[in-house]
Amino acid sequence: MSGIVVGIDGSAGSERALEWAASEARTRKLPLTLVSAWHAPSAAMAAGMAWGGVNPGDVSGELRTYATKRLDAVCSEHADELAGVEVMQSVVQDSAAPALIDAAEGADLLVVGTRGHGGFAGLLLGSVSQHCVHHSPCPIVVVPPPTG
């Protein structure tokens, strides 16, 4: 996949990353792929099956639907920033870091946000952004969260 890949999780940090990635995609005339990962914890799935009240397929379907609606909402909320950019959406059943690394294969750039901490904690990246920095198959930009 060529173009720019950006991770979206609904956080302020990922929305800031989306704004940066959209601007970069427009400037470089590249397509932009928004990736939202969802993951059904196996313990929760097992508990549901053990209690007999939850069908794992139903849980997976609901999580996928929620992730898709969340990604659609982010696109709507950022319609101005995304104007003039070819946008694709990808909803992936996986943990965030592996989903982003897979999506970035063949991409020109991977863009991720990071959590917002000040002081000493601010020197540390979140686990997803840190994993991506070390394993991305393409150049990566880690966008800091909004200040204030």
Predicted regions and their residues:
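Structural beta-alpha unit
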Residues: 13, 27, 76-110, 147-148
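Glycine-rich, Arg-bearing micro-motifs that act as flexible, cationic patches
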Residues: 109-134, 145-148
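Short glycine-/small-residue-rich Rossmann-like dinucleotide-binding loops
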Residues: 9, 75, 115
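General small-molecule cofactor/ligand-binding pocket signal
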Residues: 33-35, 88-92, 141
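A short alpha->beta transition loop at the rim of the catalytic pocket in nucleotide-sugar-dependent
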Residues: 137
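Small/aliphatic-rich secondary-structure junction motif
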Residues: 2-54, 103
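A short acidic, glycine-rich active-site loop
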Residues: 53-70
